[in-house]
Curated annotation (Swiss-Prot):
InterPro entries: EFTu-like_2 (IPR004161), GTP-eEF1A_C (IPR054696), HBS1-like_N (IPR015033), HBS1-like_N_sf (IPR037189), P-loop_NTPase (IPR027417), T_Tr_GTP-bd_dom (IPR000795), TRAFAC_GTPase_members (IPR050100), Transl_B-barrel_sf (IPR009000). One of its GO terms (molecular function) is GTP binding. The modification N6-acetyllysine is found at residue 617. The keyword Magnesium does not apply. It catalyses: GTP + H2O = GDP + phosphate + H(+). This is HBS1-like protein. Residues 198-210 have a biased composition (Polar residues).
Amino acid sequence: MARHRNVRGYNYDEDFEDDDLYGQSVEDDYCISPSTAAQFIYSRRDNPEEEYGYEDLKESSNSLLNHQLSEIDQARLYSCLDHMREVLGDAVPDDILTEAILKHKFDVQKALSVVLEQDGVQTLKEKSERAVCAGQPSKVISRSSQSESEIVPKVAKMTVSGKKQTMGFEVPGLPSEENGHNVRAPYKGPPGDDVSIASPNVPETGTPKSTAHPPSLQTSEELGCTPTPLRKSGKLRQQIDVKAGLEKRQGGKQLLNLVVIGHVDAGKSTLMGHMLYLLGNVNKRTMHKYEQESKKAGKASFAYAWVLDETGEERERGVTMDVGMTKFETTTKVVTLMDAPGHKDFIPNMITGAAQADVAVLVVDASRGEFEAGFETGGQTREHGLLVRSLGVTQLAVAVNKMDQVNWQQERFQEITGKLGHFLKQAGFKESDVAFIPTSGLSGENLTSRSQSSDLTKWYKGLCLLEQIDSFKPPQRSIDKPFRLCVSDVFKDQGSGFCVTGKIEAGYVQTGDRLLAMPPNETCTAKGITLHDEPVDWAAAGDHVSLTLVGMDIIKINVGCIFCGPKEPIKACTRFRARILIFNIEVPITKGFPVLLHYQTVSEPAVIKRLISVLNKSTGEVTKKKPKLLTKGQNALVELQTQRPVALELYKDFKELGRFMLRYGGSTVAAGVVTEIKE
């Protein structure tokens, strides 16, 4: 109750006797001390000389604005600056960009190359740090002039000795807000002062040369700061030796692109996953994790397949759906491995992988009934063999898998090789380019080393699978041809720009190169190149790379686009003529027949507009003009039309980019090569 009495007996009148001064600070009633004023209040009277110098600098700069560039040249300069800003961002100061543009007479490509060849951001940081260090002895410019400092050249160095001053400026190429002109001329100091220009390669337009200074006036060494010299680029981008660089980069090993194909459930992913594990590309900890997870999912035998089947849906269904890509090395080769899907629903993805391959491994199941199911009509073994041969693969290794389930029987192996060998010969493979190897993907027999099993060694004395891959001959790379890259994936990465992945079919690319995307007909710049998850400065034909691009909207790029050089672009068309080979089809092909065109990584609906002629298979001579229909096994010249433009190359110019496949109703009906581009 004592608290209640205190509240009831409280005298509130004492609280209302004070004046209401809560609207102002208590410190307003007291004078500021002289020491505080000297520390925090700026006095203009302390810097009369600097105020005079700045005003003269401003007047001199304004007086030179109207004597540098014409309005047309200013507009060209602003356009070039905007274009280079899109590529470089804010890392490079405008004065360096302006200097490069004017030095190369408004040629954006040359100016951009010069800026990128220099050490770039690191050198610029060093310059800015040294500029700040050199500016420390000078006094602070008044705050009232900071709002107008955008039109004043940046002070690179200032050394004072006696009454004379030695100043240097890096002239920025920023537009003036007052009259729309460009500050480009060297600064001419106040009357009576000796001025030296620190910016190199500045064109002189009606400005007298600076006078030389005696050594006694230079005191920059006393301040501990020296002017940053311009650094020369190591070697020109045009002088790169790609062939020598390839040998040096790969340690003398040759590049080989390998695709693994075969019927569904033949054991492709398990076979190659176990090989990668035996080669040391997959560590034991990761492999143990896959084994435990596969056991929990009730798929213990799929542990090695999970090395390549990374997505949850692929692991859940136990079927490869997309092309898995990885890298491993043999004694003489650097191999890019592509694990293609075997299910018939994912044949388009398999074509994408096969179109990027140099050689192939065909995996067949040796189990009773399984080989027959994949090899007979409707199986994917036949179709995959035809597809890879039609797409330019000439060397093939046939891995007869799951031989342990038939106790390594020589009779079963010979039965399979007899049937497959006859078919592959009809498909166009040479007997010398086809090798048959008995393997077991689950147990790892005869993969990386020759088998020690007595059941196998008593009748097989040949190579293991890894030795056969190492014996493949890599194709001749089209490094000297114009640059071509087929986009297989597009994604947004961290930072500016976006990324595209694909195989370089011809030529080479370097960071900073201008690229043209077809058929969107949009240009961009290669900001970065990644090869096997490692950043590189360049990449050449045969490499599977990821390019970081800037200067283009990601919406305009799709899977199937082709990047090329702006000077030697690829043609985009909707109508073209081609020579096609008809496969086993149930319905004859007639005029107006709808097909699905598979070309590299693109899949586009098309229509056969004209049947021009039937050709002889061996000689190519015309045997019949204007046929009404085409049946299986015929070789014909036709004209196709696509719904949207497709970037194509003639087969005679680019064999890698001149092949395509035609599918209808879930099956491959024809393979062809481009002979003429109409429009």
